Amino acid sequence: VSLPHAEKGTHMSRFMTFLNEKNQLLRLDTVHMALEQLVHTMESEKVFLDMEFPVFLKRHAPVTGIEGLLDFNCVLRAMFTRDGQRDTLVGVRANVTSCCPCSKEISQYGAHNQRSEVSISVRPQEHVWFEDLIDIAEKSASSRLYPILKRADEKNVTEHAYDNPK
């Protein structure tokens, strides 16, 4: 929270009371409502929220179907002012596989693959799901990552990446 110049600190117990009262899904509308309430509860001109957290999603290997959990880094940053201004940033970081197009073009026997990180940040006007941003990140790569792969899966992932150099 922002503090008036005459204040030396904030009312920390109000934060804990406020957080204990908020047991809601993490959605833009609930975040905005919570920040609007917090700016008044804390008697502040401006409040900020800055969160980074992992989200674990189930992934099935492409051939064997073996299931595993894969982690993605999610970001939520928001600001709300007493006069109603707000700014929100939602983002994800997803690890993917990329096959080098140049390497594929100049090589007769294959191409090199790399693990890459795709970062997406948006300032949404309405609710956006982290899973949708993760899907966009994975589709922008040669291949998504899988937590568990057997030989048949490895072959599939390698060939898929080779057919989709990015």
What is each PLM-predicted segment?
Residues 1-166:
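N-terminal intrinsically disordered, cationic/polar leader segments
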